[in-house]
């Protein structure tokens, strides 16, 4: 039986505290995570059938972190058309990543975001949810990239300029 790639979303959630930039990361703990559980990751998840990609991103971030997204870079630039009962949007994410082999056949749309609210420390899909300094994340990415969920590495390298 023919199988198809699953569309997903991920969020690079930024914050600045005392003139220092942080992003939100968590430890992966998915029901179907297998060997990827225990890796550092961005909040992410699957897009439901006919779900608006920006609403999917908001839902996944809320479910996994407790935070509410207040801004998604590029959302205001989306193009929308509604003709004969069909609604279509076009958008530009920060980074698109496709897994070509391995455990997951995924196309991941990663967006830059801001969020607010009470941060959870653990959910049924993630643990150790926390803000990490950009410089600390750069060190992990350079020295131990195997600790980061593979589908998030390219977007993080782009974001961090490495």
Where are the predicted features?
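N-terminal strand-loop-strand
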Residues: 1-41, 69
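Short Gly/Pro-enriched turn/cap motifs at secondary-structure boundaries
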Residues: 1-3, 99-103
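Short, charged/polar surface micro-motifs in flexible loops or helix N-caps
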Residues: 18-19, 31-32, 48, 78-81, ...
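Short secondary-structure capping micro-motifs at structural edges
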Residues: 58, 95-100
